Amino acid sequence: MQKNFTFDGSISREVLNNYLSRAVTHCGLGYDNDVYSDTFEDDLRMLKNEGAKFIGRAAYVWHHSVPDREGFAFAKKRLARGHEIDPEFIFQACVFECIYRPFVSRTPVPAYVFEAFGLVPEDRCFSFDAMKLSGEPDDVWGMPQTATPDITRTEAQMWFFYRAAEYIKAGCEAIHLGQVCRIGREDPDFICWKLVIDKIRRFASIHARRHYVLIDAHTLGWLRQDDTMFDYNAFPIRLKEIPDKPMQCVCEEEYLDSMFNPRDGLCRPFLVEFDNFGRSAFPGIPDPSSHFAWGYDEITWFSKCDADYRTQFLNYITDWVNERYPEGWVQMPSRRCLAGGSRYNYSANTRSDACPHGWTDEETIKSVFGRT
C-alpha cells in the first residue's frame, strides 16, 4: 500500500497518520542508557524490509550513560547510516521523567541553552538539585540518586530543551517527553511545558532535517483533549488477562487507565505501545487490578508467548484498535528491554547468523503493515 511520507516545515494530518501506521519501537540504534544494539546493520535491514517508517525510542537515557558528547555523536553517526537506508525514516529520541544525579552533574550546559532562556552563559554543569521535584525520596525510580524533574524550575526546562535540541541535531525528527503530568505536577495549566515545547519547536524549525519535530508524551485524561502541545498521544496498551486461558490477553475499553477511553475525547491520532516497567512478585499469575500482564510488563509478556500466539495477537490488536479508532495505531514491538531472562532485549529480527537471538516476528510485522 503506497503512502505519502513527505513533509517539510509542517506535517499534514494525512502524513502524520501514515507515519504512525508504520511505527515500531526500536531501542538501541543510538544509546539506550549505556548500551546499544549489537545487531545494528541487521536491524536496519529488518526495518526497511518491514516497511517501518517511524522508529520509536531510537535513542535515550533513563539514568546512567556515556558522557553526552559521546552519546550524541554516536547517535548522529548511526542515524545518518539509517537515513542512507531510507531517508524517510523518522527516528525518535526520548527525554524522560527520570534524572540521575551523577549523569546530570557531569553534563555541561552549552551556551546556546542559556541564551535560549535569556540568561548569560556560565561555565558549569547542570544542577540536579536545581531541577528535581520536591517531596520525593532519593530513590524514586528504584535506584539511588534518582528523581523526577520539575518543569516549573528553569533548570529542568533547560535540561529538556538541551536534550531535545541535541537529539534534533543528531538527526531525530521526533521527541517523546515521558510522563508529562508527573513532571508537570506543579504546572497544572501546562504553562511551563508549553514554553519548553515552543522553544523545542522553534529550534527544530531551523535545525531539524525537515524543519519540523513530532512531539508526544504519555498523556492522561483531559490532556488527551488538548490540541495545542502535542502532535499525537501515546500510552501503554494496558492488557487485560483472560484468567482461564494462561498467558492470553485482550484489549478492553475503559480498562484501568488505558488510552481506549472514548470519554477522554481523543482529538489527535495516537499510538499504543508494548511498555516495559518490570515484573510483579508473582510472574505467571493473573491480577486484573494491576498493570502487569500475567505478572510481566507488556513487552516481557509478549516475548514469553509462543510464535503462533504472537502472530495472532499482533493481528488481533491491530484490527481491534483500527476498528474502533480510525486514527489509532499499534506501535509494533521491534527491539525493547525485557524484565529478566537471559537476554537484555526482545528483537523482532528473523533469527539468523546476523541476529541469532531474534524472535522472528519480522515477517508478521511486515504483513500487518502491508494491509493497514
Show where each model-derived region lies.
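Glycan-processing catalytic domains of CAZymes
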Residues: M1-T372
